[in-house]
A protein has these predicted regions:
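Short beta-strand segments in beta-sandwich/barrel cores
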Residues: 2, 19-24, 42, 66-67
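Phosphate-/nucleic-acid-contacting segments
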Residues: 117, 124-182
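Cyclic-nucleotide recognition modules
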Residues: 33-95, 103
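A residue-level structural signature of the nucleotidyltransferase/glycosyltransferase Rossmann-like core
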Residues: 12, 34, 67-68, 142, ...
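Regulatory nucleotide-sensing modules
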Residues: 1-17
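Conserved phosphate/pyrophosphate-binding and hydrolysis machinery centered on Walker-type P-loop NTPases
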Residues: 8, 111-118
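Amphipathic, well-packed alpha-helical segments that form the structural scaffold of globular domains
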Residues: 96-99, 103, 122-130
């Protein structure tokens, strides 16, 4: 993990390569994946705009990653100095990413409230098919996702995710084997 709840907040990260996930964790160790982020995305940007002493979520690498980091304090100094001409463009890019995440989170909250587990899994698999680390396959799109990870994405148990995948496979909607879903 790059950071965990309770860790000091004071750094903005930029994903140069690889993929990371943001995860909310409950006291009983249950986890909900809030989102995946890849190359070209900022992570940990909240502290630029609201004061917070500590992190509230987990930032976990999903693959080999290269991350750039800069302290909020140093970035604010650069905005007042050498980066002043580019500050509005950079802040707009960060704001745009935050807006997309808010939209994604709103959709996820709606799904949790209004859809059953089966529909949440189908929609989540559809969303994952649009991610950069999905692969083209003769029968559609190949995803590499464990049942545990899928459960964390949709807010259900690993067993329930497995049952739904099995039913979807029986219905001919997809093919699942191990961590591979087509």
């Amino acid at each position: 993990d790059v950071f965990r709840p309770g860790d000091p907040a004071g750094t903005l990260y930029y994903v140069i390569s690889g993929s990371v996930s943001i995860i909310a964790e409950e006291d009983d160790d249950r986890e909900l994946v809030l989102g995946y982020f890849g190359a070209g995305e900022f992570v940990g940007e909240m502290g630029l705009f609201i004061e917070s002493d500590c992190r509230e979520v987990i930032l976990r690498t999903r693959s080999a990653c290269e991350l750039a980091e800069i302290s909020y304090e140093r970035l604010h100094q650069l905005f007042q100095g050498p980066l002043a001409p580019d500050a509005s463009r950079l802040l707009y890019a960060i704001g745009s990413q935050i807006s997309k995440r808010l939209l994604h989170t709103s959709r996820k909250a709606s799904r949790l409230a209004f859809l059953d587990v089966s529909d949440r899994i189908v929609r989540t698999l559809h969303d994952l098919a649009g991610e950069p680390d999905s692969m083209s396959h003769p029968q559609g799109t190949q995803l590499r996702v464990s049942r545990q990870e899928l459960a964390r994405l949709v807010g259900c148990s690993r067993e329930m995710a497995g049952r739904v995948l099995k039913k979807l496979q029986t219905d001919g909607v997809l093919h699942a084997r191990g961590k591979t879903v087509v």
